[in-house]
Each structure stands twice: as C-alpha cells, then as structure tokens.
C-alpha cells in the first residue's frame, strides 16, 4: 500500500494548478473565493486496487465570476484539454513523485453560491494513483 498521504496528494494537485496563470488556488473548500479560482474538494479512496496500488478520486471545482455571462467563456477555457488557462492540462501534465493524475470527467456546469455570492462553477474529477 502507498505511503503517500492525503495531504501530499492535495499539495501535489495544488502545485499542479500553479501552472495556470492568475488562478487562485484553495487547497480546501473555501468560505470565500476570489475568482477565477479552483479548489480541491472531496476525496474518495480505494485503499488497495487489483494491482496493489491506492486509488484516490478527487473533486476539483473551478469557479468564475457570475457578474457577466461571458465569464462562461473563461470557464470553458479552464476546462479545455489544452491552452494557457487549461486546468485540465495543468493536472494531466503534472508529474509529482510517486503519483499519477488522470482526469476522468469534466462537467457539472452550475451556479455555485459561496458566502451568499453566486458564481459559475464546474467540476473536474481526477483519479490519483499512488
């Protein structure tokens, strides 16, 4: 079984997100946000897979302003498979020691309320194998 901790996985994902210029990164679901941003939300862990590894499914939520509907364009760019604003590319390009990141699904576009303020948001579901 892997000796890599949940905290190390969270930190490695946060470091991967640093590749996106101007993106505010929250390692935990925040009480307040400054968009554009991404936060690392919940974990679902399979301690021992068929090949003896640990598999952690991580929800990463990306958030943009709700002030103008054209912010959906920014959200789209964050969810594209490549490009300077691609959160997906930042995650898939990361090579932290002892970890492999795989983007499993992207979507769930919605309005998200944080601290009584509405934002546009979507989810990136990441599988981390250690």
Across the structure, where does each feature detected by a protein language model lie?
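Charged, amphipathic alpha-helical segments and their flanking helix caps
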Residues: 1-32, 44-130
């Amino acid at each position: 079984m892997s000796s890599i901790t949940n905290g190390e996985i969270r930190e490695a994902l946060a470091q991967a997100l640093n590749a996106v210029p101007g993106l505010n990164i929250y390692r935990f679901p925040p009480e307040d946000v400054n968009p554009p941003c991404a936060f690392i939300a919940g974990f679902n862990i399979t301690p021992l897979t068929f090949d003896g590894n640990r598999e952690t499914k991580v929800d990463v939520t990306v958030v943009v302003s709700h002030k103008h509907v054209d912010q959906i364009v920014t959200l789209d760019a964050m969810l594209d498979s490549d490009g300077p604003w691609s959160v997906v590319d930042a995650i898939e390009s990361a090579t932290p020691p002892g970890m492999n990141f795989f983007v499993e699904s992207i979507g769930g576009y919605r309005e998200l309320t944080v601290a009584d303020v509405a934002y546009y948001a979507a989810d990136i579901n990441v599988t981390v194998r250690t």
